[in-house]
Each structure stands twice: as structure tokens, then as C-alpha cells.
């Protein structure tokens, strides 16, 4: 792996690994090696959820559990993590098998998001909980400063449905138009048909639900509600 690219990634992450093999494992998709990043992803997912929940709890002392849950969901969802990955230029650093490389896996949101979680797990194992908490909060500083409780934190499908109902319009319809990948690593493509939008809106995700949410979010943007 290109050391220049790896060093640039570590600068963008704000962390230099002592155990280099942990970094390489975090960047390794299961299509590339049996020593892949899924266990690190499992660990990182839990750590990220805790750090964000703790930050929201202390930032919003008067906000109820429901609003905090919705804010956390916004901050840890796949497309937010994929945005972080693109800020880190993470796609250039991924270790992918030939099939994933050919299909553009280095651009796929689900792979980028999973790798960010794996990096969180790897940094924790390479350091301690205080270090990874500090790093996550630095990554999320702008997003934490900008987020606020309220209807905007409801998931996209709920917001789209409420908007259409409020305007006495038909509910959206969601149709699976493509499923690719093996059972353990699938990508779903959904078309969402919405009254007021001429063409179906497309969303992709690692599950049908995530793809529907992504399509609903795109529909909201076209309706200028995002």
C-alpha cells in the first residue's frame, strides 16, 4: 500500500497508528482478504454510538430521549459516515478484491461508512477510549455545532410521508430495481415515486430499508425540504 497515501490518511484522521497492522486491517474489505475489517467495524459502531450519545446528552440537557435518539441517528447514519470518508479521501486507501474494484466499491457509500467504523475500532484498540473519543469529537465538531432537535431529525421516510399527508397527496411508492453483491454484502437500489416529482428518485444502501431512506432523502431535496 502506498505509504504517501497512508500517511496522508493518518494526517486527515488526526491519528498515527503504533500498530500499523490494525490500520491495514481496518482498510481491508472482506473481498480482499480473510483478515478483513468486519470485527473492527462491529466494535467501532458501538464506540461511535456511545461517544455521540454522550456528547448529545451533555450538549442538550433539556432535550428528551426521542429527540436525542433522532439526532444521534442523523449523526451516525451511513451517508454521514460516507461524507466523513470522502473528507478523509478514504476511497483511495481501501483494500478491495478484484470484483469490488471493478464495480467501483471504493465509491460505494456502504463500504466507505463501514470502513470509518472499522477505523474507529482500530484507533480504540491502538490507543484508549479517551483518545478515540477526542478524535471522534474533532471529526464531528461542525456537525455537532450545527445539529438541533426537532422535526428535521426525523428519518427521511417519515418526513416525506408527513409532508405528502399534510398536502393531501398520495403516499410514495418504493420499488427495488436492483440488488447486487453476495448475501453478506449486498447493495440495494430503490426507485421512489413521489407525486410532484416527474421521474422516480433513486436511492442505494446496504439494506432495503437504508436504500428507501436514501431515496426519500433525495426526494426531500428535490422538493426543497432538505
Swiss-Prot record:
Source lineage: Bacteria, Pseudomonadati, Pseudomonadota, Gammaproteobacteria, Enterobacterales
Subcellular location: Cytoplasm
Entry annotation: catalytic residues: 45, 117
Protein's gene: rnc
CC per GO annotation: cytoplasm
NCBIfam families the record matches: RNaseIII
GO MF, any single term: metal ion binding
Protein name, per record: Ribonuclease 3
Reaction(s) the record says it catalyses: Endonucleolytic cleavage to 5'-phosphomonoester
Gene Ontology biological process terms in this record: mRNA processing; regulation of gene expression; rRNA processing; tRNA processing
UniProt subunit comment: Homodimer.
Record has Secreted as a keyword: no
Residue span, DRBM domain: 155-225
Cofactors, names only: Mg(2+)
Role, per record: Digests double-stranded RNA. Involved in the processing of primary rRNA transcript to yield the immediate precursors to the large and small rRNAs (23S and 16S). Processes some mRNAs, and tRNAs when they are encoded in the rRNA operon. Processes pre-crRNA and tracrRNA of type II CRISPR loci if present in the organism.
Originating species: Photorhabdus laumondii subsp. laumondii (strain DSM 15139 / CIP 105565 / TT01) (Photorhabdus luminescens subsp. laumondii)
Amino acid at each position: 500500500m502506498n505509504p504517501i497515501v497512508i500517511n496522508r490518511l493518518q494526517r486527515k484522521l488526526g491519528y498515527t497508528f503504533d500498530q500499523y497492522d490494525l490500520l491495514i486491517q481496518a482498510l481491508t474489505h472482506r473481498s480482499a482478504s480473510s483478515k478483513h475489517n468486519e470485527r473492527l467495524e462491529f466494535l467501532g459502531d458501538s464506540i461511535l454510538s456511545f461517544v455521540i450519545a454522550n456528547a448529545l446528552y451533555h450538549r442538550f440537557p433539556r432535550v428528551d430521549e426521542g429527540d436525542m435518539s433522532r439526532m444521534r441517528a442523523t449523526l451516525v447514519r451511513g451517508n454521514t459516515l460516507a461524507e466523513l470518508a470522502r473528507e478523509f479521501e478514504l476511497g483511495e486507501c481501501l483494500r478491495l478484491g478484484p470484483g469490488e474494484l471493478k464495480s467501483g466499491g471504493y465509491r460505494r457509500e456502504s463500504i466507505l461508512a463501514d470502513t470509518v467504523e472499522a477505523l474507529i475500532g482500530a484507533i480504540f484498540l491502538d490507543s484508549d477510549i479517551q483518545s478515540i473519543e477526542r478524535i471522534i469529537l474533532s471529526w464531528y465538531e461542525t456537525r455537532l455545532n450545527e445539529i438541533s432537535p426537532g422535526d428535521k431529525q426525523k428519518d427521511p421516510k417519515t418526513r416525506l410521508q408527513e409532508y405528502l399527508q399534510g398536502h393531501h397527496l398520495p403516499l410514495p411508492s418504493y420499488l427495488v430495481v436492483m440488488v447486487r453483491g453476495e448475501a453478506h454484502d449486498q447493495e440495494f437500489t430503490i426507485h421512489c415515486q413521489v407525486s410532484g416529482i416527474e421521474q422516480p428518485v433513486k436511492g442505494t444502501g446496504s439494506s432495503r430499508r437504508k436504500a428507501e431512506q436514501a431515496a426519500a432523502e433525495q426526494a426531500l431535496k428535490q422538493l426543497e425540504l432538505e
